[in-house]
Amino acid sequence: MKQRLFIFIFLIGIMTSCTTDVVDNGIIIDPNPEKPDPEPVPEPEILPSLHVEGKWLVDPQGNQVVLHGVMDTPNMYFNGWRWGSPWTNNTNYNDAGAKKCLDYFEKIFTGLEKAKCTVFRLHLDPAWTNDPDNSYVYAGSAGQAADASGEADISKFNPERLTHFLDTLYLNLAEKAMKHGMYVVVRPPGVCPGNLKVGDYYQQYLMTVWDIFSQQSFVKEHAGHISIELANEPVNLKNAQNKEDTKALHDYFQPIVDKIRANGFTGIIWAPGTGWQSNYKSYKTHPIEGDNIGYAVHDYTGWYGCSDESVDRDNNIEKSKEKKIKEFYNSVPVVDFAPVIITEVDWSPVKPGEGHYNEHGDWVESNYGTWSTGSTSKWGVCYKANLDHCGNISMTLSGTSCLIDVDQLLKDGSVVPAFGGEPEACGKACMDWYEEYYGKLKN
């Protein structure tokens, strides 16, 4: 009896073992093997912090860094009404509108990352900071010229709206850009009026903007990734006595820099020049003082002695390149001792159609949709020659739509050059250049 019981228990043991092990060609296989832990999802690559050493942007490993990207502005009109309009879907510059804007720019940043962009110039667009109340007048606009108009008019600026939309829009845009591998250069709301002088109302306006901005914890925590461009396109700037003075630029912007530093922001600050950001001669003798200082420059066709008409592409292109480099050095001597970023530049060739007069009263031939008219094989090669010669010039094209076809991106996620890939326009040229520069950056 005991023997039978033993055999029975033995058989039960075999049957039980067969429920966990399967024999296949003599190999015991566990039908419920332990699953290996899933591969961890890699964390997004963290941008190295940047600082200034001499005339270079430098990362923590001492590598010299040059950045390439675009500027853009969170504005329904300038974004082609792609994320809303007051007429079609009741979109306004409020918190609900901010969410739509953020969703739109998430798609834009995805495309810019694919286009090998490493920097984004963010405009704190006044559409958000201006108060919609018709009766509201910003007290700080006292002293503004009666004919101030457009984005040079600060009479509707509301500091409380700036603070609010820094929290709900602007800094969220900056964070999104950084998560897509781009450093962020922040420009103040609007543009400078035509005439400035040390101690004027507009200097105080900029002081207020940057005081509020540089107190933000997020900004100070990301001082190696977010930088400040102090003003957009000063034209004429005089001293406190309204006289020409080589120290006027320094005296206008140095107090603003000092306020930013007093608030604890240690990151890079980009100072502008006069002449719509084309003249930096006075900074050679009176530079902005302190650490992490660079200069923000603009470059368009016809500036710095270079245009399609002046370039001898067929007979002596090297001489044309040398002239561009010489004229740029003459106007922007700071490139010898500080990093420079060209925060506005674009070009496209003449295209049959109607031209127009720009805001300076200059006639502009019809082109593919850029501010200035020129071609890559003439003006463009001289522009790039200057970038490569200097070595310490970063750049942002004047808009996302100057680099990539935004509508195509939104349609199917593909990233193709703007203007149908026209080889003489900045979109195709810069997509090629950015890929080249990106490869060097990663190697």
Say what each PLM segment does.
Residues 67-73:
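A short, well-structured catalytic beta-strand-centered motif of the EAL phosphodiesterase domain
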Residues 55-59, 408:
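Short polybasic amphipathic segments
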